[in-house]
């Protein structure tokens, strides 16, 4: 399971039965946009198999000391940052859900979300990813042309 956007603070997939979990550490875990790293965690049986085939020798499984330092720096503020992300995202969701211009909002805190019950059961909070539908393509273009916080970028979140 890719847990990049949830982090271990919002979801702990191994406790929920996942066999392998991956995290893009360059996003929430680092939090400053100045490192490229990731990691995986797995059940012992799977980790033993990975060690046996020496997968780390092929994939370069060691993070450098500078990257490790930068990730640890980010982890110190992860809870505070995620608290703010979750609270602010819920405000955006509430605004969008109340807008006459928005047809549908997709966010797990909403009871009409298809996976709402699963999210309530498995997540401590609902994270910072939300999507929504406008009434038409033209309306969507108008929003994208007038929202200054969103930009096309090579890296998600930076």
Where are these regions (language model features)?
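Conserved PLP-enzyme active-site core in the AAT-like
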Residues: 1-101, 106, 117
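Conserved C-terminal alpha-helix-loop-beta "cap" of PLP-dependent enzymes
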Residues: 101-158
């Amino acid at each position: 399971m890719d847990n990049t956007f949830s982090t271990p603070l919002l979801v702990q997939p191994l406790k929920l039965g996942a066999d392998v979990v991956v995290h893009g550490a360059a996003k929430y875990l680092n939090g400053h946009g100045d490192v490229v790293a990731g990691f995986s965690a797995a059940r012992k049986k799977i980790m033993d198999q990975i060690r046996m085939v020496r997968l780390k020798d092929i994939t370069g499984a060691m993070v450098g000391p500078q990257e490790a330092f930068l990730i640890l720096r980010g982890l110190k503020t992860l809870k505070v940052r995620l608290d703010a992300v979750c609270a602010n995202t819920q405000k955006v969701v509430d605004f969008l859900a109340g807008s006459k211009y928005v047809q549908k909002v997709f966010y797990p805190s909403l009871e009409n979300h298809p996976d709402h019950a699963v999210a309530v059961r498995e997540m401590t909070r609902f994270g910072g990813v939300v999507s929504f539908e406008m009434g038409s393509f033209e309306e969507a273009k108008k929003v994208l042309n007038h929202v200054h916080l969103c930009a096309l970028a090579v890296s998600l979140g930076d």
